[in-house]
């Protein structure tokens, strides 16, 4: 355990699995105080235990549905000003535009975009009052950076996340607030496993996802975590309005 993030209060959405879970463990190991939230409250307790076992301070855990109006605002409003907001919640819709209903679009925008708008809007006043804060948005290389097949809804929402990131950075740079986005390639997470299962043949799906990665393999969640820690730390104090591609060469 080090002290790179000692004393920092960090709020994380979608903390129970995948990249969110790995990030909470790493952030806590660096000395941060974590507010870990997820709709899967059954997994949050095991996360708490894992953080403690890894040498970090026990995170404060809360069930949170980021699509519920007022829920994010109420939770963040009950806390002291945040040092770091990590928006990790997301949903991947599979299919073309002709395979996506209005409900599909609404649901994806609610999770992938509107939840970030709400959390940022709730966190900003406290950050501005202290003239410091780092906002980290989970985006994707599948966005305005690169088009991928069968990702019409997802790519559109993640392009919106990049636009939101740039806008927040531009509006609040003079207030001491930084806002950046992380754009992973294909990461081996429970979310990916669900998408593989939806395709029917899991092994063929894994081969398909792996084939689009020039490195010939999927990323592990632990390979995304270092950039999360960097953006949460004061080491990134001169970085804002940027997106960081951690994609195994997919955007070369």
Descriptions of predicted regions:
Residues 120, 157, 165:
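Active-site helix of classical SDR
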């Amino acid at each position: 355990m080090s002290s790179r993030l000692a004393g920092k209060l960090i709020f994380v959405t979608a903390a129970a699995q995948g990249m969110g879970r790995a990030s909470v463990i790493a952030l806590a190991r660096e000395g941060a105080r974590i507010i870990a939230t997820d709709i899967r409250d059954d997994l949050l307790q095991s996360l708490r235990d894992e953080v403690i076992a890894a040498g970090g301070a026990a995170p404060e855990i809360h069930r949170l549905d980021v699509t519920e109006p007022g829920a994010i605002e109420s939770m963040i409003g009950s806390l002291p000003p945040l040092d770091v907001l990590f928006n990790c919640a997301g949903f991947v819709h599979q299919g073309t535009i002709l395979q996506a209903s209005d409900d599909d679009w609404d649901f994806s925008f609610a999770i992938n975009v509107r939840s970030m708008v709400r959390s940022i809007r709730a966190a900003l006043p406290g950050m501005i009052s202290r003239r410091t804060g780092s906002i980290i948005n989970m985006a994707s290389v599948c966005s305005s950076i690169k088009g991928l097949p069968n990702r019409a809804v997802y790519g559109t929402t993640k392009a919106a996340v990049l636009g939101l990131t740039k806008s927040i950075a531009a509006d609040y740079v003079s207030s001491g607030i930084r806002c950046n986005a992380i754009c992973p390639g294909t990461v081996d997470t429970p979310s990916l496993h669900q998408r593989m299962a939806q395709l029917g043949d899991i092994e063929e799906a894994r081969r398909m996802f792996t084939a689009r990665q020039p490195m010939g393999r999927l990323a592990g969640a632990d390979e995304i975590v270092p950039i999360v820690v960097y953006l949460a730390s004061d080491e990134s104090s001169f970085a804002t309005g940027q997106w960081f591609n951690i994609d195994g060469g997919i955007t070369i």
